[in-house]
Regions:
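N-terminal helix-turn-helix DNA-binding module of bacterial transcription factors
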Residues: 1-60
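Central regulatory/effector-binding core of bacterial HTH transcription factors
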Residues: 86-128
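Short, well-structured alpha-helical segments in soluble
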Residues: 102-115, 220-234
Length: 321
């Protein structure tokens, strides 16, 4: 394997001079530059990319921590991140976590070792305090409201949309609502806030039997509908965590020739248009784009960008496109 020392020996120049030519750093005469490049071509020498990154202090790689891609939240977020990355010289590395705190800490240690120029946490299992401790090693962007933590963030400002949705339900005398969530309130701030905002409008929390967690896919939604239908035929509405999941709930009732309860979806997917399901559009692709811009812009450290979510009724999702 040809090394930089071989290029230096055959060209007659020092390894440091060859390094300056390879990395385009420091002064090298035109004659010297030409000679060294001729030898590199003759030897078919390919510079070590890792060594070049070390010499420049940058990898041009951004790590994106994703628990999974089974839910539209993550796929839409990733779409926005990739769109933004394609406009830059950075590449994106997907770092699957399944909310495993050990894996997430491993990725933070990789940031500490400069294996990435920055990390985007689309969601997390570890605490915000743990994330904060690693910001001294490189940019970290989270995709949730970090509150008073010194973290850079791009996230959905969802409270007004949720209050509007629950008020709409209450105004229509909807009392029995089933909630579908990915994770329980004990580990998910999104779940906890949703229940809090429901209580703010209704004056009480939903019954525990009407809260179903571990729902991330349409198949999960279908099974959740089956569970509810077998126990309670008085449910008026399902407040779901995805339009595709809402569509799966509907499909169960259709398959069983049962009256279909009302549905509210989330994430502004095509299913909300084709089935005319009210939805909460969080604009996750836009959040992903903002998260990427923040992680590659260290001067924006600790900035918090809120993207307003919208409660969308009457098949108006594509109205302004």
């Amino acid at each position: 394997m040809v090394t930089i020392k071989d290029v230096a020996r055959i060209s007659g120049y020092s390894p440091s001079t060859v390094s300056r030519v390879i990395n385009h750093s420091g002064y090298v005469s035109i004659k010297t530059n030409k000679k060294i490049k001729q030898v590199m071509k003759q030897l078919d020498y390919v510079p070590n990319a890792i060594a070049q990154d070390l010499s420049k202090g940058k990898t041009h790689k951004i790590g994106v921590v994703l628990p999974h891609l089974r839910h539209s939240y993550f796929s839409q977020m990733l779409l926005g991140i990739m769109d933004a990355a394609l406009q830059t010289e950075y590449s994106v590395t997907l770092l699957p976590s399944e909310y495993d705190s050990n894996l997430e800490m491993h990725y933070l240690e990789q940031l500490k070792r400069k294996e990435y120029d920055g990390l985007i946490f689309t969601s997390r299992g570890i605490s915000l305090s743990q994330l904060t401790q690693y910001t001294k090693y490189g940019p970290i962007v989270c995709c949730e409201n970090p509150g008073n933590k010194h973290l850079t963030a791009a996230f959905s400002d969802r409270k007004a949309a949720y209050i509007q949705a629950f008020t709409w339900l209450k105004d229509h005398s909807i009392a029995k609502i089933v909630f579908l969530f990915s994770r329980p309130a004990t580990v998910s701030m999104t779940t906890q806030l949703t229940l809090d905002w429901f209580a703010q409008v209704y004056g009480h929390f939903p019954a525990n039997k009407h809260i179903i967690t571990n729902v991330t896919t349409p198949q999960d939604g279908y099974r959740a509908a089956q569970t509810i239908a077998m126990k309670d035929n008085t449910v008026q509405y399902f407040f779901t965590n995805g339009d595709d999941i809402a569509a799966a709930v509907r499909q169960y009732y259709v398959d069983q020739h049962l009256p279909v309860p009302g549905l509210i979806g989330q994430n502004g997917q095509v299913a909300s248009v084709t089935l005319n399901i009210p939805t909460i559009n969080h604009h996750y692709a836009q959040i992903g784009r903002q998260a990427f811009k923040l992680v590659v812009s260290p001067e924006l450290k600790n900035q918090k960008i809120k993207i307003k979510a919208d409660f969308v009724l009457n098949n108006q999702l594509f109205k302004n496109l």
